[in-house]
Amino acid sequence: MQFLDQAKIYLRSGAGGPGAVSFRHEKYIEYGGPDGGNGGKGGDIVFEAVPGLNTLIDFRYTQHFRAARGASGAGSNKTGAGAKDLVIHVPVGTQVLSEDKEEILHDFTKVGERIIFLKGGDGGRGNASYKSSTNRAPRQHGPGWPAQEAWVWLRLKLLADVGLVGLPNAGKSTFLKATTNAHPKIGNYPFTTLHPQLGVVRRHGQEFVLADIPGLIEGASEGIGIGDRFLGHIERCRILLHLIDASGEDPIAAWHEVQNELALYGAGLAEKPQLLALNKIDSVDEETCAELSQALEEASGQKVLLLSGATGQGLDPILDQLITMTGRAIEKAQESSAQTEKIWSPI
């Protein structure tokens, strides 16, 4: 499946239908009064977050969305039919931004979340509604209220329990493939992964969503290598699994580089719960592995887990710890949500 995490689209709601100009025509009634009905309401533009979507690729091919106009009114005081709403399905995690990207207009965080983004115009008045004691045969009518239109950006920030971070070629895709049902492209060169990949880890009757974020480089927080878009996906992850390549030139510098980019980007990325693993330990000898592990623990101030995504060594302890950490993170989020609801309860 192709991945697209932002798209610019044009939206236009439906205009209201015009009111009718009509007069009652019946046998033996010489001067039938006005009986023109009102026009129908135009269709709304509606966004709805649905399950099963994790890309905005459909918006690459369809970029203009127009709801239908309301039907015209008719004689015998018949109101025109209202137009159907145009419902646009988006993945959970989608943000709707203004055309200049300066304002977040809505943020979809739950399946089934639905908003009316642009309202359709009301129908115009038929001439029957203009009748008065001084105007028995009005011929004026309302044309219907105009449509609303807007250019907006859709931006997707993936919702995942655990986000894999690290420099390019740190072994993130290999880890994803070894632990989930995902089939990412794997290669022994930097930037093999060009788009975020999702997989589901199932273990001991529990499961969590794992996201492979493309490798970060120095300057990613400023947009170099579109790294700011990749960092945006990390915002929604509850926990980060930071993989360090044991066979890299300077694993300690690699750790500092990624941590620095997380801090520079902001949005609380550097404060997220993090698990640190020294990957590709099968490519170095035991002495080197021990030295690197100790140096990383001193630099980071946290325990370093040893891992080889290729051979499977060290996978089980990491997955067990991630399950524990995601459970705590979910409980904490639920408690926070419950407290917020309690604070704002009108009772």
UniProtKB/Swiss-Prot annotation:
The keyword Transferase does not apply. GO terms for biological process: ribosome biogenesis. One of its GO terms (cellular component) is cytoplasm. InterPro entries: G_OBG, GTP-bd, GTP-bd_Obg/CgtA, GTP1-OBG_CS, GTP1_OBG_dom, GTP1_OBG_dom_sf, OBG_GTPase, P-loop_NTPase. The keyword Cytoplasm applies. Residues 160-327 form the OBG-type G domain. It is found in: Cytoplasm. Gene3D superfamilies: GTP1/OBG domain, P-loop containing nucleotide triphosphate hydrolases. Its cofactor is Mg(2+). It is an enzyme of class 3 (hydrolase). It comes from the Bacteria. GTP binds at residues 166-173, 191-195, 212-215, 279-282, 308-310. One of its GO terms (molecular function) is GTPase activity. Keywords: Cytoplasm, GTP-binding, Hydrolase, Magnesium, Metal-binding, Nucleotide-binding. Residues 124-144 are annotated as: Disordered. Its main location: cytoplasm. Its EC number is 3.6.5.-. Mg(2+) binds at residues 173, 193. Monomer. Belongs to the TRAFAC class OBG-HflX-like GTPase superfamily. OBG GTPase family. An essential GTPase which binds GTP, GDP and possibly (p)ppGpp with moderate affinity, with high nucleotide exchange rates and a fairly low GTP hydrolysis rate. Plays a role in control of the cell cycle, stress response, ribosome biogenesis and in those bacteria that undergo differentiation, in morphogenesis control. This is GTPase Obg. It comes from Zymomonas mobilis subsp. mobilis (strain ATCC 31821 / ZM4 / CP4). The gene is obg.
